[in-house]
Regions:
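Conserved nucleotide-sensing/catalytic segment adjacent to the nucleotide-binding pocket
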Residues: 26-34, 83-147
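Loop/turn-to-beta-strand initiation segments
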Residues: 55-56, 86, 113-116, 161-165
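Charged, amphipathic alpha-helical linker segments immediately N-terminal to NTP-binding catalytic cores
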Residues: 1-39
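A glycine- and Lys/Arg-enriched "phosphate-lid" helix/loop adjacent to the NTP-binding pocket
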Residues: 29, 129-148, 157-209
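Post-Walker A alpha-helix
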Residues: 72-73
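Pre-Walker A adenine-sensing motif
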Residues: 41-51
């Protein structure tokens, strides 16, 4: 993906050079944060959120297939109080969902005050995946209006006390290919393989282009994107 300087960038590998347009958060002698300590801190804040019941947290996790969305959510869940943590996954809209406006299907799953909710894909799929695989006549889509609707929707959530954190899990072409092959080669991962994975690989270039546009259009001060 060709990056432009619209989102905050976080590199898990301190030796990885900054991508064009992004200063790395790890420079010079900076060290990676201790993962275990960071996760325990997240868990502590999540429990405080649950006890306080005055605000909510929505974590939107996006990225191509095999980018690690499920794994990230499982890790967060391990350190969270299960009473106040929920996770939901959004794939291709079904017939009922496609018959409504695109925000309709995510609205019932938004966090209540005190809750932390993680979305594996989300309303943003309506301006990324749906551009590659439309669920209705292509001529009926108006993408600028959808971008504006998402910005307004997230600003509304923030104004009402929901913190919106959006994470894009970036994946190089080579790593994407290797992870797809692992799904076939390793028995314990084979259950995750689907024919749609092949189609997703074929459409990778288009998907990445639409993703870059979507991230640029929906990155706001209130609800920024973080690229990992």
């Amino acid at each position: 993906m060709k990056y432009t300087a619209f989102a905050r960038s976080w590199f898990l590998n301190p030796d990885q050079p900054a991508l064009e347009g992004y200063p790395s958060l790890y420079e010079g002698d900076d060290k990676l944060p201790a993962l275990e300590a960071s996760l325990e801190e997240i868990g502590e804040y999540q429990r405080r959120l649950w006890a306080n019941r005055k605000q909510a947290l929505l974590v939107v996790i996006h990225g191509p297939d095999t980018s690690g969305k499920d794994s990230l959510i499982r890790t967060l869940a391990t350190y969270a109080d299960p009473a106040g943590f929920h996770a939901w996954s959004f794939g291709r809209p079904n017939a009922s969902e496609a018959a409504h406006d695109f925000l309709w299907r995510v609205t019932p799953y938004l966090p209540a005050y005190g809750q932390m909710v993680a979305f594996n894909r989300s309303h943003h799929e309506a301006v990324i995946g749906e551009r590659v695989w439309p669920v209705r006549d292509a001529g009926t889509y108006h993408w600028p209006a959808r971008f504006e609707a998402i910005r307004n929707f997230e600003r509304h959530l923030v104004s009402e006390g929901t913190c919106v954190v959006k994470i894009w899990l970036n994946l190089s072409e080579d790593e994407h290919k290797q992870r797809l092959l692992k799904r076939l080669d390793k028995p314990r991962k084979r259950w995750k393989f689907d024919r749609s994975d092949i189609e997703g690989w074929k459409q990778r270039t288009r998907y990445q282009a639409f993703a870059e546009e979507a991230l640029a259009q929906t990155h706001t001060e209130e609800a920024p994107w973080f690229i990992v």
